Each structure stands twice: as C-alpha cells, then as structure tokens.
Amino acid sequence: MPGKKSPYGLFAGGKLKKKRQKFRWNDVTYKRRMLGLAEKYDPLEGAPMARGIVLEKVGVEARKPNAAVRKCVRVQLVKNGKVVTAFVPYDGGLNYINEHDEVIIERIGGPEGKSLGDIPGVRFKVVKVNGVSLWAIWRGKKQKPTR
C-alpha cells in the first residue's frame, strides 16, 4: 500500500497548514503581494497622486475597434524623476495644458492597476493643472493661474 500525501490525525493541523503555505507561493498574485512588487515598480511609489512637470503633449492612438487619437501628456514626476504618460480628460482639455506646467496625476482606474479602455499603455490621468482642478478650468468656474 503506497504512502499518503497528507498527514492525518488529531495533531496534523500544523503540518497541513505549513504545507498549504508552501504551495501558496505558486500563486502569482500571492507572490506579487508578498514580495511587494506592485509598490516596488510603481512610478507613484504607492501614493494615490503625484506631482509632475509636463514635458510634451502626445497623441495616443486608440485600440481597435475604435479609431481616435487620445490626447495625453508626458509627465516627469518630481519625487523620483520617472517619466510617465497621463491621459487628459474632457473635450478640449489639452488646450488648458502647456509644456512646463505643473500637473497632479492619479491612477486612471483600470483593471489590476493597468490601462483603461482603449488607451494602450496609459495608466494615469491629469487631475490638476498649476494647482487648479482641470474640471473647474474646463467648466469655466476657475481660471488657470499663470506661473
């Protein structure tokens, strides 16, 4: 009669628990969470928002089946110097952003921290320009301050 894979008995709980723990490392999401890989390679370093300087305006082509040029900006983060692409929301929102403006960016809210919808490789969006909400500027409620 061949041996059993798992111990069984009144005091086998510790051994079973230890064995389960060992096999959890085969799960990709568990491994990434335990090793802190999301924070390690995150440009925002775990923070909800970040401040940056606009380097250039870029147009990102939308994924199929859509045919559009999504307006984005390349932003260099102040905290670590990393350069990321951020989506500019609202119709004509790019008109209120110039190069060398200071912007606040946040995550765009895609699944698993990835890009959202038909915008490939863009994981962030612009929230504020020169300390004023982009939405307020776009609505005409506030004026964009000149620096």
UniProtKB/Swiss-Prot annotation:
Keyword rRNA-binding annotated: yes
GO molecular function, one term: rRNA binding
One CC-aspect GO term: small ribosomal subunit
Domain of life: Archaea
Matches recorded under Pfam families: Ribosom_S12_S23
Keywords: Ribonucleoprotein, Ribosomal protein, RNA-binding, rRNA-binding
Entry keyword annotation includes Protein biosynthesis: no
A single GO BP: translation
InterPro entries linked: NA-bd_OB-fold, Ribosomal_uS12, Ribosomal_uS12_arc, Ribosomal_uS12_euk/arc
Role played: With S4 and S5 plays an important role in translational accuracy. Located at the interface of the 30S and 50S subunits.
HAMAP family: Ribosomal_uS12_A
UniProt family annotation: Belongs to the universal ribosomal protein uS12 family.
Self-association and partners: Part of the 30S ribosomal subunit.
Protein name: Small ribosomal subunit protein uS12
Gene source species: Pyrobaculum calidifontis (strain DSM 21063 / JCM 11548 / VA1)
Lineage: Archaea, Thermoproteota, Thermoprotei, Thermoproteales, Thermoproteaceae
